[in-house]
């Protein structure tokens, strides 16, 4: 049977990581919009990768479970790259929580049941999760360990507690990192690893939406004043992804890798400090 790499959200970052880790393996690309998924599959296929596609709505357990069944029919799932999501300028708080928080919890739960020994997963979180103030120990535990289907019922995630789309995004991305830390224990019992990457401003179509949206001036200021003095590229995220999914990352699991050009540092100790 083939070794299968599942890529959920086959945009710039998902494709870049897949290129680094999928040679000689079967790539299953999954996304909400079939036309985008097929376009990404054509690019990878023309580059020599063995590719198939599927449609998935990560906010639906039934849809994610169907994707798991498709993947396991192809072979042993040795890698999961979850890069699907929506940004603050693209969706309401309710949609962001459903896709970015609940959706990631579903992917972790469902693929955690089938990941092959020696396998690895990378979930794309965000620097925004590091921009959220400290939560209580009880809130951390709720985000990390509440069963996925009960997660959106938590008091801290109700409409009267979530201020706006940015706040929903920050909570979701903080939750992603906490969730992966907890899920690493369960994945480890199968001999597998899982980590998050929290990128800063990476030049993807999603970032362009933010840069041209209502908060664009603030995003440009963040790029200018972060220590790196620039945004990042999907290939740079893929470098970290390849480490986490490969043998050199064999002792790394349950971790969150912040790669933001020093943006968080600038907010805490530099010119972006409040």
Give the location of each predicted region.
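Canonical Rossmann dinucleotide-binding motif of NAD(H)/NADP(H)-dependent dehydrogenases/reductases
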Residues: 1-28
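Conserved glycine-rich Rossmann-like NAD(P)H-binding loop of the short-chain dehydrogenase/reductase
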Residues: 24-39
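Rossmann-fold cofactor-recognition segment
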Residues: 44-62
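Hydrophobic structural elements of the Rossmann-like NAD(P)H-binding subdomain
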Residues: 81, 122-124, 194-197, 207, ...
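Catalytic loop of short-chain dehydrogenase/reductase
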Residues: 85-90, 117-190, 201-204
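C-terminal helical subdomain
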Residues: 106, 161, 169, 174-177, ...
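Short C-terminal tail/terminal secondary-structure segment
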Residues: 253-274
């Amino acid at each position: 049977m083939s070794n299968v790499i599942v890529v959920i959200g086959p945009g710039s970052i998902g494709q870049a990581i897949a290129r680094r880790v999928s040679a000689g393996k079967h790539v299953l690309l999954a996304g909400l919009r079939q036309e985008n998924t097929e376009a990404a599959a054509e690019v990878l296929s023309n580059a020599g990768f063995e590719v198939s596609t599927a449609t998935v709505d990560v906010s639906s357990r039934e849809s994610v479970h169907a994707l798991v069944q498709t993947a396991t029919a192809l072979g042993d799932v040795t890698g999961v790259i979850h890069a699907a999501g929506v940004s603050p300028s693209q969706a309401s708080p309710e949609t962001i929580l459903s896709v970015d928080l609940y959706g990631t919890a579903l992917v972790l739960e469902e693929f955690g049941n089938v990941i092959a020994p020696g396998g690895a997963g990378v979930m794309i979180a965000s620097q925004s999760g590091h921009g959220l103030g400290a939560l209580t120990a009880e809130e951390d535990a709720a985000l990390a360990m509440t069963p996925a289907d009960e997660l959106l019922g938590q008091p801290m995630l109700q409409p009267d507690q979530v201020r706006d789309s940015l706040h929903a995004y920050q909570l979701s991305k903080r939750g992603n990192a906490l969730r992966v830390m907890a899920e690493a224990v369960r994945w480890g019992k199968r001999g597998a690893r899982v980590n998050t990457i929290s990128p800063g401003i990476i030049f993807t179509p999603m970032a362009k939406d933010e840069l041209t949206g209502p908060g664009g001036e603030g995003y440009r200021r963040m790029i200018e004043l972060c220590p790196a003095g620039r945004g990042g590229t999907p290939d740079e995220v893929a470098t970290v992804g390849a480490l986490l999914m490969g043998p050199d990352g064999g002792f790394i699991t349950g971790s969150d890798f912040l790669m933001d050009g020093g943006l968080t540092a600038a907010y805490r100790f530099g010119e972006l400090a409040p």
